[in-house]
Amino acid sequence: MNRRFRMIVIALAVIGLAYAVANAYYNVCVYILGLIGYMIWSDYREGTVFLATQAFHKQDYEKTKRLLAEIRNPDHLRKNRRNFYEFMQGNIALKEDRIDEAEYHFQLASRLPWKRDHEKGMVLINLANINLRKKEYDRVTAYLDLAEKLKLTPRQTDILQKIRDNVNRFK
């Protein structure tokens, strides 16, 4: 849910709360207050990362960028949301050729916890590619070594091998 939809739900809940208080339905008031509290908490801790992730998977990068821009303070996101936030910000920056900003976001994402190894592997592969562009081969091999310790998909393993071949060719 985006911020606008959450605010509409909160406004309707406040109207319902006023009705419940006026008619002495105090047990309903507790549920409505819980709904309002959850809406505020989810806006603060979840943000629009889930919607942005869906748009990102559909390769709608403008919508992804707009949804991520709705998040006022990414430091307040839950760790499981923050990692995807940083990953998507890094990919958007990479697509717009802002290499240093992309590296910053991917480095933040690499320090956050990931549920699956192949997700963290994509972050490390992106970091290796960025440093390959910068011709910082020592850092590339460090990222490749970290990525090889993870359980990766066959496609990711092929990408790692191609990057390693490029590093060996240019060293």
Report the location of each language-model feature.
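Short coil/turn linker motifs that delimit alpha-helical repeat modules in TPR/alpha-solenoid proteins
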Residues: 40, 77-81, 115-118, 153-155
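Amphipathic alpha-helical segments of tetratricopeptide repeats
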Residues: 69-73, 107-113, 145-151
